[in-house]
């Protein structure tokens, strides 16, 4: 695929190029290349074809530009967010899978179905791309706890120990879903009565909740010890408040200490876990500090999938997620400016890009766009697709070397918004984002037309259809004067086809 030829263009005041972007209720992302020539910067862009569009990697000499957002290892020492498959997309929309035993299972899966999906992760290209985590969402557990009051699996559906051995034998890892509550029947378990650590609160599902300031609560780390014996590698801790959709469940309004308890138990277990806290958790203080000190990632929004639909996903449902990510990363920018390490990743929810439009409910262009956003945000890349019917585009989106190179880069430098014309980070329809620059001067730039705001985007609609926007080097972070101080000796343009 060759670049279209553009005459380098600039004037004495700024470096702009108008970029027409088309909406049609999806985000069109164009190729933007920054390149150096005789100590000057130019912009070059390429409009997407009907099927493919590109991102560029930008190169400078070995000096970090201002306003970069480098990350450190996550709290539990992971270099990047988790990649793999999660079951909730199928559980929420079982109509999408003709072979799914809906009459028998409802929204609960069994071990046979999990194996049929996760075995697909053992495809060499998928595994080489880092998709190695098989994540079981809600429904694997029993309503009856063991004699110690610990949550265990539903033996009529699963043998989690055997499943773990199978997955690990295939070179995969296993994740489990959890919630802060536990069946109230556990109240009388253990010699230190579990109920002595409960608060006086029962939700509509007859779950009770721990007082996480009670020292006996940490004796419940036996739960993590049990899960370690099963070989669990990742925990999704859902319904953590403040945040989450909890009003209809009668859950307590503040369960942030559950993340602290899980983190402490993980630390004492000696096993390397990834802990994802969910969903749409409160990002104001003191809770922002709690997530940063106890989790590897947090869900920035609620579920993006519909329920009981014939489609996995509707594209407009990501508007609120994109806006919540913008707020999330802006907080990280403030932390970085205050010399705080950036260890927490923003999780955008499952990634529905693996199946064709007739299954997914999104077009090929929209699938391209979703992949870019999830990669740029350094999100967990948990596929929500039916892994048994991946099409060619789905496989390429997931496993292409350029996709994985971009994902590895963005894991170190999550994208941050830089609005055209101002360089600000407010919510706008026509948005530019940058990941990096790295200490070697590499960066990715995304231009997005989010389309008309359907109510959750946080911005004012400027119009539908094709729009024009201009961006400058200064918009992306470094000023022209600071750029000219860098050694911008000519180098090859390395174009990475992201999708």
From Swiss-Prot:
- GO BP annotations, alphabetical order: carbohydrate metabolic process
Instruction: Mention any one GO cellular component term assigned to this protein in its UniProt record.
Output: extracellular region
Q: What is this protein called?
A: Putative alpha-galactosidase 8
Q: What's the gene?
A: agl8
Reaction(s) catalyzed by this protein? Hydrolysis of terminal, non-reducing alpha-D-galactose residues in alpha-D-galactosides, including galactose oligosaccharides, galactomannans and galactolipids
Species this protein is from: Emericella nidulans (strain FGSC A4 / ATCC 38163 / CBS 112.46 / NRRL 194 / M139) (Aspergillus nidulans)
Homology family? Belongs to the glycosyl hydrolase 27 family.
> Which top-level enzyme class is recorded in the Swiss-Prot or TrEMBL entry?
hydrolase
Known function: Putative alpha-galactosidase involved in the degradation of simple oligosaccharides like melibiose, raffinose and stachyose, and of polymeric galacto(gluco)mannans.
